[in-house]
UniProtKB/Swiss-Prot annotation:
Disulphide connectivity of cysteines: none
HAMAP family assigned: SlyX
Organism: Nitrobacter hamburgensis (strain DSM 10229 / NCIMB 13809 / X14)
Gene3D superfamilies the UniProt entry points to: 1.20.5.300
Name of the gene this protein is made from: slyX
Protein name from the UniProt record: Protein SlyX homolog
InterPro entries referenced in this protein's UniProt entry, alphabetically: SlyX (IPR007236)
Length: 70
């Protein structure tokens, strides 16, 4: 192989590496954004669960009184 062929192959590899680095960075940003959203949703679900438990605890329970028609 000639020096030109090697230089062309190295150039092609460098271009592929550059595109791969860009793709990896884009994917990393997407994953980071998704984790932030997952964390926010997890906190929101926990908060809603706590609010439901509080609402159920504060709800008046059933009384043992017979219905009025007895």
């Amino acid at each position: 192989m000639t020096d030109k062929t090697f230089a062309d192959r190295i150039d092609a590899l460098e271009m592929r590496l550059t595109y791969q680095e860009e793709t990896i960075e884009t994917l990393n940003q997407a994953v980071t954004a998704q984790w932030k959203q997952i964390d926010a949703l997890t906190r929101q679900v926990a908060e809603l669960g706590e609010r439901m438990r509080e609402a159920e605890a504060n709800r008046p329970g059933p009384t043992n009184e017979p219905p009025p028609h007895y």
